[in-house]
Amino acid sequence: MKRQEIDHIPFDLTVEILTRLPAKSLMKFKCVSKLWSSIIHNQSFIDSFYSISSTRPRFIVAFSNGSFPSDKEKRLFIFSSSHEGHESSSSVITNLDTTIPSLTVSNNLASRCISVNGFIACSLYTRFTICNPSTRQVIVLPILPSGRAPDMRSTCIGYDPVDDQFKALALISSCIPNKDSTVEHLVLTLKGDKKNYSWRQIQGNNNIPPYSPVTMRVCINGVVYYGAWTPRQSMNAVIVCFDVRSEKITFIKTPKDVVRWCNDSILMEYKGKLASIVRNRYSRFDTFDLWVLEDIEKQEWSKQTCEIPLSVWDSVENFNMSFPGINKFGEIILAPTCLSGYHLRSFYIFYYHVETKKIRRVRLEGIADDENFRRCYGIGSGQCNVFISPEHVETIRFL
């Protein structure tokens, strides 16, 4: 009796099945055959995979292992998990996705670690690194050119959905006492041969008044936003808007309380609109203000004060908290800015629902709560700064 031949899976069905698989599995399956490799590298497949991934975003936690005298000992760990359930209290298991050697981050204007369209961008003063946890591609951008000392440097990444283009934006602001701050704007287009990557001056923005950038950046629908004071001496608050596609810079007038220094005001997207969460660093963490840009043309803002019972923080060592973003349930996420130093403690994040005013706590299991892991990588011997991206979308794209 002849063995019946197994029918081949139709090509379209093969493609459909592959789009449903995890990104890491696809990276392994490229070695199965030339056909599968060509499918996975096809731009149409990459776009389809990203579209499906956007319906199931992942929760990303990145943290460094403290301060070491040698760069060889420094590490940046990137953990991820599927989105947590909408419950009053729960725990979520996280998995280590990627480890980036010789890289660390800190909590200041010159350092940041954020997710933009599937890529994690990490900046630390003159060094700017971009990685894809799914493909494990790591790109170290050229060091920023020397400026006139003293100055402050910061970098971020923006994405233009029209041209499907990533660009890095660098700000070099002068820090001369008793003078208005001048800012040099540099751009690097993430396209082509990486050996030819270079920073270039933004053209056509000669009429920009002096200003001092004072907040972290956020990219929403092709525009990078950040808070600033202009002119520096009178400290008028504005939101600076950098259009990634046109590379034009404009200002949005804001109430003074919308923009504060560094982590005291955090910009984010709230229900499709630009928002700023503002807290008072000199008081106990029981209230914060949510400012929302309701009409960008009229430059009109709304304000809502949110209250949190102090008993919520019983499981947290200190009140040094940050606001990483908002989830699909409309909950504002609150999280510690660093890991527990020398003590093996659980890592908790909190969710505050603006409309119902309810707050819930979620324990993230696996975030450096293993003694062997901490000892192996030196966690606890220095400040371990934490950055969270709650809406990370996996991509198999390479830059």
UniProtKB/Swiss-Prot annotation:
Gene Ontology, cellular component aspect: cytoplasm
Record domain F-box: where: 3-49
InterPro entries per the UniProt record, alphabetical: F-box-assoc_dom_typ3, F-box-assoc_interact_dom, F-box-like_dom_sf, F-box_dom
Cross-referenced Pfam families: F-box (PF00646), FBA_3 (PF08268)
SUPFAM superfamilies: F-box domain
Designated name of the protein: F-box protein At1g30790
Originating species: Arabidopsis thaliana (Mouse-ear cress)
Lineage, highest ranks first: Eukaryota, Viridiplantae, Streptophyta, Embryophyta, Tracheophyta
